[in-house]
């Protein structure tokens, strides 16, 4: 669970003032103003102690909650020492609230104070990636596999870097309808040592026909079935590709383990003997038809003829 963010409520419309906490402070001031910090300490302690009426568990005790990210995309314009102090105050508040779950902090912003992130007791660090860009206003065309070939972390030499877990709090190769990009992107994350990978964002079914959630993203199994299959295959990549495992550079890395991605065919595939998943029509033969336990796809394959447009 991400405990806090400091954005308005209006996207894509204008914000509507509600008198909430986020309207009392500027996005950057909220992390430096003493009164605001004190309020956040009280808030985060109350949040983890909150009892979910449906489960009967406080968030800090819920077995289905694995940890907390303290802030979504914080703003730290000050010094390393000021940033470290801010984080430590939040950590102390959580400790007093008897939280024992792992705690993470966003490190993909404010890199001038990056040293502070690794000089605290947070167990994990969170990152994001939009390798194709964002908010282009149209569906982009082309081969974007080179764009997802590497994920370089410029501050990986900082003291303490390798002692923190690495999590992706959001990613998307946005502004396109291709199905070949998700598995390649997740492969690159695993090569870079990431242990948790979150795609942003899935369109709710009631609005998915119109792509009105956050238009730069578009993903829903009913309306973008090829992309949804690509993400399904990417989930398998996250489990099957080893942390730090490398497959060379593009185009050699379009074939890796039991996976294949192709820009020309707009295709992602998993073919491991027991599972045969494909995001578009393919001529690939399953490794062993007699051992298949799961088939999922769009279009046709040597084992399924399908003329529909869904999955």
Cite the ranges covered by each PLM segment:
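Active-site mouth of glycoside hydrolases
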Residues: 1-122
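Extracytoplasmic/secreted cell-surface and envelope-processing proteins
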Residues: 9-10, 78, 113, 135-136, ...
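Flexible loop residues that form catalytic
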Residues: 73, 130, 202
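Glycoside hydrolase catalytic-domain groove-lining segments
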Residues: 104, 112-175
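Glycan-recognition surfaces
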Residues: 122-153, 220-260
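Substrate-binding cleft of secreted/luminal carbohydrate-active enzymes
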Residues: 179-255
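Long, low-hydrophobicity ectodomains and other hydrophilic envelope-associated domains
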Residues: 239, 243-311
């Amino acid at each position: 669970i991400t405990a806090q963010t400091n954005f308005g409520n209006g996207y894509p419309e204008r914000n509507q003032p509600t008198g909430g906490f986020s309207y009392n402070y500027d996005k950057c001031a909220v992390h430096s103003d003493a009164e605001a910090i004190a309020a956040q300490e009280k808030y985060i302690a109350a949040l983890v102690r909150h009892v979910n009426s449906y489960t009967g568990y406080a968030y800090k005790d819920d077995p289905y909650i694995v940890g907390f990210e303290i802030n979504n995309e914080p703003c730290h314009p000050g010094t390393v020492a000021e940033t470290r102090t801010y984080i430590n105050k939040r950590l102390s508040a959580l400790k007093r609230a008897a939280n024992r779950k792992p705690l993470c902090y966003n490190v993909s912003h404010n890199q001038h104070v990056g040293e502070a992130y690794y000089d605290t007791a947070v167990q994990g660090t969170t990152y994001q990636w939009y390798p194709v860009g964002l908010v282009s206003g149209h569906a982009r065309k082309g081969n974007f596999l080179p764009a997802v070939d590497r994920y370089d972390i410029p501050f990986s030499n900082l003291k303490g870097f390798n002692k923190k877990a690495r999590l992706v709090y959001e990613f998307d190769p946005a502004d396109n309808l291709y199905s070949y990009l998700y598995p390649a992107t997740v492969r690159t994350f695993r090569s870079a040592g990431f242990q948790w990978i979150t795609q942003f964002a899935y369109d709710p079914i009631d609005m998915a026909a119109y792509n009105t959630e956050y238009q730069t993203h578009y993903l829903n199994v009913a309306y973008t079935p090829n992309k949804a299959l690509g993400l399904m295959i990417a989930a398998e990549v996250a489990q099957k590709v080893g942390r730090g495992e490398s497959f060379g550079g593009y185009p050699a890395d379009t074939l890796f383990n039991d996976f294949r991605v192709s820009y020309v065919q707009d295709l992602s595939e998993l073919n491991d003997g027991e599972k045969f998943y494909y995001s578009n029509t393919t001529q690939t033969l399953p490794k062993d038809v007699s051992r298949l336990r799961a088939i999922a796809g769009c279009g046709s394959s040597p084992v399924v003829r399908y003329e529909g447009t869904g999955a």
